[in-house]
């Protein structure tokens, strides 16, 4: 993947680079994500690009973001015919389908203000959108209060990676 050819712009999360959390998440994604997969809070599409390249069994990948400019950047970057794009706010609107796997680097800011409840709402949306036995792969800053939400909405979860800044988790519905 050539970063110089990707479309983004100031104001979109990690607009000019691949963020460290997403890079850590990608290093822990399996090759088989299932047939129906979603990228919740897709941003400019980095995680989706990696999933489509690394998991050939994906039949459909839904890219979902509440930020219109981010979704349009993802649309420009992710041209694979398996990708579909949805402009919606997962904190208040249901996902468009059910999934085998949801991958997420959830937002936790509104503007410049910290809003961990936003990330918690996205995790709850993932739980509602996953098929029984479906998997959530999640990266988040270590200090965010997401474990209680994972415990409340998933049958199990485990930490796949943990460094001084980020934690990658897999949760099973």
Which residue stretches match the model-derived regions?
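Short beta->alpha hinge that forms the Motif I/post-I loop of the SAM-binding pocket
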Residues: 65-69, 118, 141-142
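Core SAM-dependent methyltransferase catalytic element
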Residues: 155, 162-173
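Conserved class I S-adenosyl-L-methionine
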Residues: 141-154
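A short glycine-rich, Lys/Arg-flanked "PGG" loop and its adjoining helix->strand segment in the class I
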Residues: 119-132
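A short SAM/SAH-binding and catalytic strip from SAM-dependent methyltransferases
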Residues: 101-113
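Conserved SAM/SAH cofactor-binding pocket of Class I
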Residues: 19-104
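Class I SAM-dependent transferase core
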Residues: 1-31
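Short glycine-dipeptide loop
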Residues: 57, 130-135
């Amino acid at each position: 993947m050539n970063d110089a050819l990707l479309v983004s712009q100031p104001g979109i999360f990690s607009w000019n680079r691949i963020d460290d959390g997403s890079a850590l998440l990608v290093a822990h994604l399996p090759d088989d994500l299932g047939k129906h997969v979603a990228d919740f809070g897709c941003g400019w599409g980095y995680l989706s690009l990696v999933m489509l390249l690394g998991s050939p069994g994906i039949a459909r990948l839904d890219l979902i973001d509440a930020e219109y400019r981010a979704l349009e950047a993802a649309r420009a970057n992710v041209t694979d015919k398996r990708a579909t794009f949805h402009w919606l706010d997962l904190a208040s609107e249901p996902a468009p389908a059910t999934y085998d796997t949801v991958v997420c680097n959830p937002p936790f800011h509104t503007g410049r203000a910290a809003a961990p409840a936003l990330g918690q709402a996205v995790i709850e949306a993932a739980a509602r959108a996953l098929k029984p036995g479906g998997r959530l792969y999640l990266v988040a800053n270590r200090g965010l209060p997401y474990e209680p939400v994972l415990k409340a909405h998933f049958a199990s979860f485990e930490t796949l990676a943990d460094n001084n800044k980020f934690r990658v988790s897999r949760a099973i519905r």
